[in-house]
Amino acid sequence: VELSKILNEPSIVVGFNKQSGLFYCKNSKTTLLFVTLDKRGKPATQKYDDYYEDNFFHWDSQAKQSFNTPRIQEIVQGINKIILFARINARTKSTTNPFVNCGELRYTEHQRSKPVHILFESIDYDDFSTDEDLIDIYLYDPKEKGKQTSNNINKQGKTLISDRIE
């Protein structure tokens, strides 16, 4: 409910049903990106390559989306503000896990189509975060990481959050 008030978007309460994916907020011209990182137990067609690498976030669209899909074009053209909400697992035992607000993303580049692999810069990436859930998301390392895409990110001068945590 709080999110619907912040974005002046009452349909979030009705329209969002604990699923991953894109949710467009017309009133605020904001796209909310909901991502569950751990894909274990999903069919191979749904094992998208989603993870942080330093202050960059790698995201794969759903397989049905192509580079020319309207929502993907809005992301690439920077038409809407993009806010990432992520969680490691959808459920823990019988409880649905909440999404964590990871902040604003900015499109950087993309590769391939169906699914489209998009690289975002995380505008609100916090090297000094004390939020354990957010740190876990930053450090999440899928076993298939980078298998489907190349990782050509300039990391000069960056301090990895993993370098500060023992």
PLM-predicted stretches and their roles:
Residues 1-98:
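Acidic, glycine-rich low-complexity segments with interspersed aromatic residues
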Residues 1-7, 106, 125, 158, ...:
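Short intrinsically disordered, low-complexity coil segments enriched in acidic
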